[in-house]
Regions:
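Low-complexity, Gly/Ser/Thr/Pro-rich intrinsically disordered linker/tail segments
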Residues: 244-284
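Extracytoplasmic/periplasmic beta-strand context in beta-sandwich domains
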Residues: 2, 7, 78-80, 109-112
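Mid-domain, small-residue-enriched loop/turn segments at the edges of structured enzyme/sensor domains
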Residues: 18-25, 56-94, 110
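Flexible glycine/proline-rich, aromatic-decorated loop/lid segments
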Residues: 13-18, 67, 112, 189-191
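Active-site-adjacent bridging/hinge elements
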Residues: 15, 62-74, 121, 165, ...
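A penicillin-recognizing enzyme superfamily signal
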Residues: 38-42, 86-250, 260
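Conserved catalytic neighborhood of penicillin-recognizing serine enzymes
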Residues: 1-60, 105, 117-145, 150-152
Length: 284
C-alpha cells in the first residue's frame, strides 16, 4: 500500500551509466501519487524508477541472483528498473515460478525422460519439488504479496484480457515492452502452471511504434493456456497467516514503528480507517 509519485523525473548520467535520462510512461501521462499496486496494474514506469532509487540498483542486482539472473547481465544502474538488463524467456519462467510456488526456486527442464525402443528409461530429469528439495529464496508472505500484485494486473490492469478470455480467477502476470518496442513480453501463471512469451527479432529492431507486450505476447500466452488448462480446476491460493488483507491491500501482521495494525473484515457499521492512515513503507 506504499504511495509512490508518478511524476516526471530526470536522472543524472552518473546514475545511468551513460547519459542524462528522462524516463517516460508508455501513455505519456503522469497521474501523481498512487499505490504500488495501482502503478503495477497501469505499468507506470516512473513509479518503478522511484522504487529502484529507494532500494538502490546495487541491492537489486544482488537480490535478483536469487531468481537465477546473472549480475553481469544486469548493470547496477537505475535503468535496470525498466529492463536495461538481458534475460531469456527461460530465465523469466524460472523466476515467475518462485511467485507461483510460494517462494522456492526450481529448475525448469525441457526433456522429462528418454527411453529406448523397448520403453526402457535411459534418462529421467531430476525434478526438485517446491517445499521439498528446492531452496526457498523468498518468504511465503512476500511470494503471496507478489502473487496478489500480479493477480491485480490480470484482473484490472494491462493483462485483464487473460482473465476475461480464460474465465479463470487464478491468473497472475505482467506485460512488458522495452524501449523502442524491441521486445514484447508477457510472463505469468495460472495455478501452478507458469509460462513466458517473448516477441522480438534475433537482431534487435523495433517491432512497430504501437506494439506492446499486451498486444503481441499476451495473446500467445492466452492461446497456449487455453489448451494447457483444459480440465484443470482453478487453483485456490492460501494467504499466509503472516499477512492480512485490508481494503484490497496486503499488510504484514506485525506493527511497524508501534503503529496499530489494520483490522480485518471491518463491520459495515464501523467507521473504516482512512487508507492514508493504513500506508506503510514496505520494501521487499
Amino acid at each position: 500500500a506504499t504511495i509512490i509519485n508518478d511524476a516526471p523525473i530526470v536522472i543524472d548520467p552518473k546514475l545511468t551509466g551513460n547519459k542524462l535520462w528522462e524516463p517516460k510512461n508508455y501513455d505519456g501521462r503522469f497521474d501523481g501519487p498512487m499505490t504500488m499496486r495501482r502503478a503495477l496494474e497501469r505499468s507506470k514506469n516512473l513509479v518503478s524508477v522511484r522504487i529502484m532509487q529507494a532500494i538502490t540498483p546495487q541491492y537489486a542486482q544482488q537480490f535478483i541472483q536469487k531468481f537465477g539472473f546473472m549480475p553481469d547481465k544486469h548493470p547496477a544502474v537505475l535503468p535496470i528498473a525498466l529492463g536495461a538488463g538481458s534475460v531469456t524467456p527461460w530465465q523469466m519462467m524460472s523466476a515467475y515460478a518462485v511467485f507461483a510456488n510460494g517462494g522456492y526456486r526450481v529448475q525448469p527442464y525441457l526433456i522429462e525422460r528418454v527411453t529406448d525402443v523397448n520403453g526402457r528409461t535411459l534418462m529421467r530429469a531430476t525434478n526438485r519439488i517446491a517445499g521439498d528439495e528446492a531452496i526457498r529464496v523468498l518468504s511465503d508472505r512476500n511470494a503471496y504479496t507478489m502473487y496478489s500484485l500480479l493477480h491485480g494486473v490480470a484482473v484490472r490492469g494491462t493483462a485483464a484480457r487473460a482473465t476475461r478470455i480464460l474465465k479463470r480467477q487464478d491468473i497472475a502476470g505482467k506485460t512488458g515492452t522495452s524501449n523502442d518496442a524491441h521486445d514484447a513480453w508477457f510472463c505469468g501463471f495460472a495455478g501452478n502452471l507458469v509460462a513466458a512469451t517473448w516477441m522480438g527479432y534475433d537482431t534487435p529492431k523495433p517491432l512497430g511504434a504501437r506494439e506492446t507486450g499486451g498486444g503481441l505476447s499476451l495473446p500467445i500466452w492466452i492461446e497456449f493456456m487455453q489448451d494447457a488448462l483444459k480440465g484443470q480446476p482453478e487453483y485456490t491460493r492460501i494467504m499466509p497467516s503472516s499477512v492480512v488483507e485490508v481494503n484490497g491491500e496486503i499488510f504484514y501482521r506485525e506493527p511497524i514503528d508501534g503503529a496499530p495494525l489494520p483490522v480485518e473484515n471491518t463491520p459495515q457499521a464501523a467507521q473504516p480507517q482512512p487508507m492514508k492512515d493504513l500506508i506503510r513503507d514496505q520494501i521487499f
